[in-house]
A protein has these predicted regions:
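Conserved small/polar residues in nucleotide/adenosyl-binding loops
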Residues: 131-138
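Extended, subdomain-level signal for the structured scaffold at the beginning of enzyme domains
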Residues: 1-127
């Protein structure tokens, strides 16, 4: 059986535009699908609008929201390093994946909607009848 290739798209926005309030990726919305894909042996690519490091919503790190799985990943230096080196959406826009997942967090409201590379990725996968999802579909 061929290995499935999954693209996990995460936000690069770490602050709300008009107020002094931090945001970013909601950690558990990433760790759960990441863990499931990793356990199944999928090839995982993590990308963000600009590439590079991504902010984590500090509220998602509070004990009330940080479940055991997410806490274990957050405490793993290799996992944290991976989050510091995401590919840019432009880098991966020409590739086809079996599944594209848009991870949540309020930051995504600001850098996903108008991102042309992300729009092209979603349209291309839709046109090819491949799967796309966002955190609300979990």
């Amino acid at each position: 059986m061929d290995i499935l290739h999954i693209l996990l798209v995460v936000t690069g926005t770490g602050k709300y535009p008009n107020i002094d309030l931090k945001t970013g990726l909601w950690l558990s919305e990433f760790t759960h699908i990441y863990h499931g894909a990793k356990e199944k042996g999928y090839s995982i690519t993590v990308a963000s609008p600009q590439g590079g490091g991504i902010p984590i919503d500090p509220v998602s790190l509070k004990p009330i929201y940080l479940d055991k799985l997410s806490r274990n990943y957050w405490n793993d230096p290799k996992f944290r390093d991976m989050l510091c080196h995401t590919k840019s959406l432009k880098e991966v826009s020409g590739q086809l994946f079996n599944f594209v997942y848009l991870a949540g967090g309020h930051g995504s409201m600001f850098d996903f909607p108008d991102n042309l590379a992300l729009q092209a990725i979603i349209k291309n996968h839709y046109d090819c009848l491949l799967y796309t999802s966002d955190a609300a579909d979990e």
